[in-house]
Amino acid sequence: MKTFVLLTKLSGKNALLTDIGSKLGDRPRSGLEWLNDLRKQCPEITFKAHFALMGYWDSMHIYEAQDEECAARVSMITRQHGAKEVETWLAIPYEKIVKIAEELGPGK
């Protein structure tokens, strides 16, 4: 399984505070609907963590999936559930990067 990081933004740059407030007020229900839809359409994924963020992105979800196609489905379903922006990263464990660097050797 590969590890992916899903970043989401609920509202656009120039959203009114009332728009943001209404989305946040409805977030527990809509978040549960999103998770249930993902579990139904992508049963092979396993979520590892969910975070609310203080910055450009509103939330970060770390999950494992078999491949990039599955990650693309997660991203598309997230957009269907109202996220204004979505970005997905493939996360490689640090130990694997170290191993790759060792295999390449110095100067290669």
Task: Specify the residue positions occupied by each region the protein language model found.
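Short S/T/G/P-rich N-terminal loop/turn motif that feeds into the first structured element of a domain
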Residues: M1-E44, W57, E95-K108
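Short, well-ordered beta-strand segments in beta-rich or mixed alpha/beta enzyme
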Residues: V5-K9, K48-V74
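A short linear hydrophobic-aromatic micro-motif
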Residues: E44-H50, V86-E87
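Structured loop/turn residues at beta-strand edges in well-structured enzyme cores
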Residues: I45, G55, H81
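An amphipathic, aromatic/His-enriched active-site/gating alpha helix that lines ligand/cofactor pockets
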Residues: E64-K96
